[in-house]
Design a protein with these regions (language model features):
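Conserved alpha-helical scaffold segments that buttress catalytic/binding sites
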Residues: 34-84, 89-426
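Short, Lys/Arg-enriched N-terminal segments with co-localized hydrophobic residues
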Residues: 23-36
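Residue-level recognition of conserved structural "scaffold" positions that shape functional pockets
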Residues: 17, 25-27, 167, 228
């Protein structure tokens, strides 16, 4: 039996909404303290080296709209919605080190594309030079991303190796609340010697990082024959999620709630099948299709929770006819389109206008409460925190879900996502 009504915002005050930093509510607001911080900011970057794009057809290109860091000009960051930048460091990518030169290869195709129709101010900061050590590169990336987040700008990072997930995650420390991460990777990048960081084990450093703000983690697209069963078992014990490639291919729409819940999303392009993206030493005959990649990129951009995203491991040295660079550029285009079309849903708004659906369940658990946004038709479910009196969490947490999970609960089954979240809150 179900009922629906308008949600009373006073009764539902999810942790994310109450603790969302004020700086993130006014996108583009540039606090005065950042003016002097930016004095040496662009010294970290090599200016953009993208070629001039012919406009003989009279059609605007991204090259005409983006504010790029050039040798003779710097972009205005005040009011910017998105900031792209590259990282010229692939030293921890092993035999895929050529990914260090990916940013310019991707820009070459991105700048030729027609901009999304709802274009918003976007900057291209240029490329962070490889530091004297890999840790120096990490420090530069972390400081840039942290400043962008505090300024209300969404950074999209073009790597470089997938190990750059580490400084992106560290940059979130300044936000000071529990964080959710999604990686898209054909492997689970754990294991090995944690003291020797590489693009194949960088998640060790993320999970063990202090202070530990990691609340939820999911990997999308792993392939069973590339995955250590012990790592899968570890993720299950931690109430984290690993979604197989087959599940993604069967229904890409089921991945949308996963990325909607993420503050940070990073993609290893080896998750794309080699026939669509050959430019990685780890490219495999199996993987996401080009269409899945672009759809996923749009889902990532559409998330109102997104703080930073990155696409890594593209190796121009292995790119047959630049097909891989074209695809990554198209993925960035879809991510931009998603960001420009965010709906301002939870956690950026009150849920007072959401529809509330109460589903009665048999057994000790009497009901699950679902919410539906009238702006986007997207769904959330309310997960109570059993020991909230002893913690800093509110009495419940709104977790993104799909309509199918609402149907599953209506038929008497407890959704896995609800149970995993409940276990973590307990």
């Amino acid at each position: 039996m179900h009922s629906h009504s308008v949600v009373n915002a006073c009764l539902v005050a999810p942790y994310e909404l109450r603790h969302w930093p004020a700086t993130l509510h006014s996108k583009g607001a540039l606090a005065p303290k950042f003016w002097f911080m930016l004095d040496g900011f662009f010294d970290l970057f090599e200016p953009v080296n993208a070629p001039d794009i012919s406009n003989a057809e009279g059609v605007a290109r991204i090259a005409d709209r983006i504010e790029a860091h050039r040798f003779d000009a710097r972009p205005m960051l005040e009011g910017a919605r998105v900031a792209l930048f590259g990282v010229n460091d692939g030293r921890r990518s092993g035999d895929n080190e050529g990914c260090a030169s990916a940013p310019d290869a991707i820009r070459n195709w991105l700048y030729q594309l027609v901009p999304p129709s709802d274009w918003q101010p976007t900057a291209d900061l240029g490329d962070i030079r490889a530091g004297a050590t890999e840790d120096d590169t990490y420090a530069a990336v972390q400081s840039v991303v942290a400043e962008m987040i505090q300024m209300g700008i969404v950074p999209i990072v073009l790597g470089g190796g997938h190990d750059l997930t580490i400084p992106l995650y560290r940059a979130l420390d300044s936000v000071g609340r529990p964080m959710n991460i999604v990686t898209v990777d054909p492997r689970l990048d754990f294991g090995g010697d944690p003291s020797i960081i590489s693009s194949r084990n960088h998640m060790n450093s993320v999970v063990m990082h202090e202070p530990n703000y990691l609340f939820d983690y999911a990997n999308v697209g792993h392939q069973g024959y590339l995955t250590d069963p012990d790592t899968l078992e570890l993720l299950e014990r931690l109430q984290f999620e690993a979604i197989r490639l087959g599940n993604l291919l069967q229904n890409i729409q089921q991945i949308e709630p996963v990325v909607r819940n993420a503050d940070l999303v990073t993609i290893d392009v080896a998750a794309i099948r080699a026939s669509d993206h050959p430019a990685s030493t780890h490219a495999s005959p199996n993987g996401m299709t080009a269409e899945h990649f672009c759809q996923l990129a749009r889902y990532i951009g559409m998330s109102d929770r997104l703080l930073v995203s990155g696409i890594f491991e593209h190796n121009p040295n292995l790119d047959d006819r630049s097909r891989g660079a074209q695809l990554v550029a198209q993925g960035v285009w879809h991510m931009l389109e998603g960001i420009f079309n965010q709906k301002g849903d939870h956690p950026k708004c009150s849920t007072e206008d959401y529809l509330k659906y109460v589903v009665d369940l048999p057994g000790e658990l009497h009901e699950i409460v679902f919410y539906k946004s009238p702006k986007s038709d997207r769904w959330w479910m309310d997960v109570p925190a059993p020991n909230h009196e002893k913690s800093k969490l509110s009495s419940s947490l709104l977790v993104p879900c799909s309509y199918d999970e609402y149907v599953e609960a209506s038929e008497g089954s407890l959704p896995d996502r609800w149970w995993r979240t409940y276990q973590k809150l307990a």
